[in-house]
């Protein structure tokens, strides 16, 4: 049966530059050019052109990404969907994952290590009962190394995929390591067709697993002082974030410039007769939520004044761990402490203190917290 077939050809051009000393040495610069050619007839594959070098009489043939002669032929798909595997194999492939085997990246993406896929394949088909066959050599396109693979189990075609890995020549990762990483990437993609780890793409399972086995924590960049929320395993033994990120206690209210916690007193406006007590209170920083209350006044003119201690009957206290009002939509569901810890939180408070004329209580709270932070610096 004749059909239209497209091929992806890779032209490798070699620029031969003679050395000034005429020692016949030359430098080769390899440039990959991808041309997608579509057949306009029923004769099958187009003929592959050869790249010519204007600087030299030597020529090199064009390499094809999928250069296996059987890549587009039916023989490649031997035994495809012929019959299902035995029940014993199916039970092994579709078994529930061990929650302890699942890992999570700082951005919240959960995954199963590649070695786990290999172990499941070995348990289902036995060592030697499956293989990942490459079709074509590894090719570097831009800053990515790619290579196509097909997965065979018990002599039957199962799935195919293109593995990829970021790679820059003369970088910290070698060509061999990048090729092996691309192979592992292709294996994981092929295993999806066998149902291995299919729950990792199920949104319901992802939410349930995160709620039980992962936690989100504040981390700080030790160089830029930027703060972000990263995901960790709940049962982790230590912080695994790479430098310059480190886990930070978001309970500490940062200053306006350095976002570091201030050790100034919460009760620094108390009576002068209790100086000794005030000195001991000043050592208690703002990372003690049960002692943090910010008092503010609200009058008809909507001009609140921040106080650190309870002074008058018409004042109200703000707990730094209270949830912010829902009108502050950007931080809805978060606490005042989390708002202040955010790098953009202070500017947001400044905006809120000058807005919300129709909600004087929110305006008063934002102003009170701003004044409290300024006094704590």
From Swiss-Prot:
<keyword id="KW-0238">DNA-binding</keyword>
<feature type="transit peptide" description="Mitochondrion">
    <location>
        <begin position="1"/>
        <end position="12"/>
    </location>
</feature>
<dbReference type="GO" id="GO:0000262">
    <property type="term" value="C:mitochondrial chromosome"/>
</dbReference>
<protein>
    <recommendedName>
        <fullName>Mitochondrial genome maintenance protein mgm101 homolog</fullName>
    </recommendedName>
</protein>
<dbReference type="GO" id="GO:0003697">
    <property type="term" value="F:single-stranded DNA binding"/>
</dbReference>
<dbReference type="GO" id="GO:0005739">
    <property type="term" value="C:mitochondrion"/>
</dbReference>
<feature type="region of interest" description="Disordered">
    <location>
        <begin position="254"/>
        <end position="320"/>
    </location>
</feature>
<dbReference type="GO" id="GO:0036297">
    <property type="term" value="P:interstrand cross-link repair"/>
</dbReference>
<keyword id="KW-0809">Transit peptide</keyword>
<keyword id="KW-0234">DNA repair</keyword>
<feature type="compositionally biased region" description="Acidic residues">
    <location>
        <begin position="311"/>
        <end position="320"/>
    </location>
</feature>
<dbReference type="GO" id="GO:0000002">
    <property type="term" value="P:mitochondrial genome maintenance"/>
</dbReference>
<keyword id="KW-0227">DNA damage</keyword>
<dbReference type="GO" id="GO:0003677">
    <property type="term" value="F:DNA binding"/>
</dbReference>
<dbReference type="InterPro" id="IPR009446">
    <property type="entry name" value="Mgm101"/>
</dbReference>
<dbReference type="GO" id="GO:0000725">
    <property type="term" value="P:recombinational repair"/>
</dbReference>
<keyword id="KW-0496">Mitochondrion</keyword>
<keyword id="KW-1135">Mitochondrion nucleoid</keyword>
<dbReference type="GO" id="GO:0042645">
    <property type="term" value="C:mitochondrial nucleoid"/>
</dbReference>
<comment type="function">
    <text>Performs an essential function in the repair of oxidatively damaged mtDNA that is required for the maintenance of the mitochondrial genome. Binds to DNA.</text>
</comment>
<comment type="similarity">
    <text>Belongs to the MGM101 family.</text>
</comment>
<dbReference type="Pfam" id="PF06420">
    <property type="entry name" value="Mgm101p"/>
</dbReference>
<feature type="compositionally biased region" description="Low complexity">
    <location>
        <begin position="255"/>
        <end position="287"/>
    </location>
</feature>
